[in-house]
Regions:
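Active-site SXXK
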Residues: 76-77, 222, 290, 317, ...
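Active-site loop and adjoining helix of the penicillin-binding protein/serine DD-peptidase-beta-lactamase fold
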Residues: 140, 196-214, 274-286, 296, ...
């Protein structure tokens, strides 16, 4: 009686412990997720290009169950856990069978580990013991409560060992057969899925006879467990092909692991936030053509050893190619990605300054600008050749890349406004960041690229022009979805069409088929040679120089970088024609301009001509013809030249009122239209300049400067 009571108590205690044990266990999936898979990189067509091995140097991939052949799934269930879908993590029927077989034989000849228990063992390896088995069983039941059978089977097939450093069905399929797991037939699946019991003993590359014996046993298990019809096991074993690869040569895994396009993949991985399947926008064929062209041109430049290029698809804003080094394996600095390095940009920033001036209504392509010696304090810029042209059209000043006209425009726009512009183009840090103070120290010299910018950021900025003035961050991924707040209108389509017209006026030597809008740049001291060009389809940036900063006489944008840019574009369009430029006639209407100033003609302008203007931005009237001096100026009634205190929302609401009506209003060089005298406009803290212009030319313009403080 006492013995029976004790047995009953022990049984009750054991059953209670068995029932409650899972509630004291944590989820094994948390440890599985620490076993990260290989990172795979794919091109824009979905072709696998590169594999980075795991942190523990394993071959392991995470693929969904749907990408594993049903044959492989059936084989693994038959061989490892035929009643997988009928238990809760522990197969009590298998436990009873194993216990009886082991008891009657006097030794352990059979196990009862389910797929769930094996997965726990993979997640949390422990020394084998009865205690370990109990813990595994409890954790397996916990896992089954938290996760579906589909999830558990997927994790298992992705993590089971297949010999050496091969883990998971996908890595095994690639290593042993050169196939994806989806392509495995029944013979191949049965050979592979026999490995996990003793992975290294059954490896077909080292022990083919043992592997075939194990395969035959697995096929018999499939037949016995109802996964195959009677007689099918022998039929598959004898007749279905085993497409084993030639083991005398390295596997595809090895070839995918070789260095290639590393700089591109690094950028893509960062953007993908370290995802393990990275869908890159790279075009490998274009990249190879670009790399070849850069290498050919470097050999022709004395004292020049490095080059880089970035190619952006204007429609998608995808970085189609990034070449950051000519030889990644160069022991000195081959792994330095010069496409993201900060270098002096020379004259490459000038188109952005002209764009801003056009959008401010300050000028058009026919406006006359001075090219004479100029001094601002201690700063006295000169042109590259040391010569001056006195006066010339804006289009010529930009096309010839003259320095003093660009500096004059920055002075009129103000350096603060230009720095804000560069921030909008992501060429500099945001204006509210500490780094923005560094930009402000450069003053007017920012027109000549003294701040330093990267090839990638400059190419991204140039891509705004063929995109009609809309900034969208460039992406290295085909899966990127840019949030709406990242899209920003920087320039009007009118101004972009005008700059494109100017930059494509001079054809590059060798540009026989494409028709490129282009701009070169040379840093002070011949340290860097740049050329940026774009078509309706692509934006391309090219840099030549030395990574160690060593100058060379050959480093001139027009003679070093421009020829390479032409060759690359011709290579890109080798098998296709470029898209035509969109019709810009509606954006660039012809209007009367003053022959003396190239500004909007007034009745005071005795000589006039018809010139190109912007459709959406009024060009400022000519103020150089003599009648202006005889006219009474407009009186700006509000605001007054004084200090205003901002309201609670951080702005000051002020009316714009003048002594006459109508009036064209400009705020900080931005045209805002004909405001009603009863409308209020919000002004942020800082210095502001209001300019009033009479559209009827009966009064001369006037301006007022005031300050808003917090």
């Amino acid at each position: 009686m006492v013995v029976c009571a004790a047995a009953a108590l022990f049984g009750a205690a054991a059953w209670t412990a068995w029932s409650l044990a899972p509630s004291f266990c944590s989820d094994p999936f948390t440890d599985l997720k620490k076993q990260t898979p290989c990172r795979s990189y794919y091109d824009r067509q979905g072709k696998l290009l590169h594999i980075e091995r795991t942190y523990d140097y394993q071959w392991r991939f995470d693929i969904p169950l749907e990408q594993i052949s049903q044959e492989a799934v059936d084989v693994i269930l038959a061989a490892e856990d035929a009643r997988f879908y009928g238990h809760n993590g522990v197969d009590l029927q298998a436990v009873a069978r194993a216990a009886w077989q082991n008891l009657t034989s006097g030794r352990i000849i059979s196990g009862a580990s389910t797929i769930s228990m094996q997965l726990v063992s993979i997640a949390r390896p422990r020394k084998r013991s009865f205690k370990t088995k109990f813990i595994q069983a409890a954790e397996a039941r916990k896992m089954e409560k938290l996760h579906s059978k589909h999830e558990i089977l997927t994790e298992y097939l992705n993590r089971i060992p297949f010999g050496g450093k091969i883990h998971g069905i996908q890595a095994a399929a690639i290593y042993y057969f050169g196939l994806d797991a989806k392509a495995l037939n029944r013979a191949e699946a049965s050979l592979l899925c026999g490995l996990p019991q003793r992975p290294n003993a059954y490896r077909p590359d080292r022990h083919p006879e043992q592997a075939r014996k194990r395969q035959k046993l697995v096929l018999k298990l499939m037949e016995r467990n109802g996964f195959l019809k009677p007689g099918m096991a022998e039929e598959i074993y004898e007749n279905e092909p085993l497409r084993l690869r030639d083991f005398r040569y390295p596997s595809a895994l090895r070839s995918y692991a070789r260095p290639s396009h590393r700089h591109y993949f690094t950028m893509a991985r960062r953007e993908a936030r370290n995802a393990f399947d990275v869908k890159c926008a790279i075009d490998v064929e274009f990249t190879e053509r670009i790399q070849h062209a850069l290498s050919q041109h470097v050999q022709q430049l004395q004292g020049v050893h490095d080059a880089a290029a970035v190619l952006i698809d204007n429609r998608t804003r995808q970085v189609v190619s990034l070449v950051g080094t000519l030889d990644y394996n160069d022991p000195l600095n081959g792994q330095v990605n010069v496409a993201t390095a900060i270098r002096s940009a020379g004259s490459t920033l000038k188109p952005f300054i002209y764009l801003e001036a056009f959008d401010a209504g300050l000028a058009t392509m026919d406006t006359i600008i001075k090219d004479t010696p100029i001094r601002f304090g201690d700063y006295a810029p000169t042109n590259y050749d040391g010569r001056f042209n006195q006066k010339l059209r804006i289009a010529e000043a930009l096309s010839l890349s003259l320095n003093t006209p660009a500096v004059r425009l920055v002075a009129e726009l103000t350096p603060e406004r230009v720095i804000d512009l560069f921030a909008s183009l992501r060429l500099t840090a945001p204006t509210d960041s500490p780094d923005a103070q560094t930009a402000k120290k450069h003053g007017l010299s920012i027109a000549l690229g003294t701040m330093g910018h990267s090839l990638l950021n400059l190419a991204q900025g140039y891509a705004v022009i063929p995109n009609g003035g809309l900034f969208t961050p460039a992406t290295f991924l085909t899966t990127s979805s840019t949030p709406p707040e990242e899209h920003e209108r920087v320039f009007t389509p009118d101004a972009c069409a005008l700059v494109t017209k100017i930059l494509s006026m001079r054809r590059l030597a060798g540009d026989v088929s494409v028709g490129i809008a282009w701009k070169t740049g040379t840093s002070n001291g011949n340290h860097d040679a740049w050329c940026f060009g774009y078509t309706a389809d692509y934006t391309l940036g090219v840099w030549f120089g030395n990574k160690n900063g060593r100058p060379a006489a050959a480093l001139v944008g027009a003679s070093a970088a421009a020829p390479a840019l032409v060759d690359i574009f011709n290579a890109i369009y080798r098998n296709s024609a470029p898209s035509p430029w969109p019709d810009s006639s509606a954006l660039l209407p012809l209007r009367p301009l003053c022959a003396k100033s190239g500004l909007a003609a007034t009745p005071s302008c005795l000589k006039q001509f018809t010139g190109t203007t912007l459709q959406s931005i009024p060009l400022r009237p000519c103020d150089q013809c003599g009648v202006f001096a005889k006219k009474a100026p407009i009186t700006i009634l509000s605001p007054q030249p004084e200090h205003y205190v901002a309201d609670g929302d951080g702005t000051a609401k002020l009316r714009l009122r003048a002594s006459i009506s109508p009036v064209l209003w400009y705020v900080d060089n931005d045209y805002i239209g004909e405001n009603s005298p009863f409308d209020k406009r919000a002004f942020a803290p800082g210095r502001h300049v209001i300019r009033a212009v009479d559209p009827n030319d009966t009064a001369s313009p006037a301006s007022v400067t005031f300050v808003v403080t917090k």
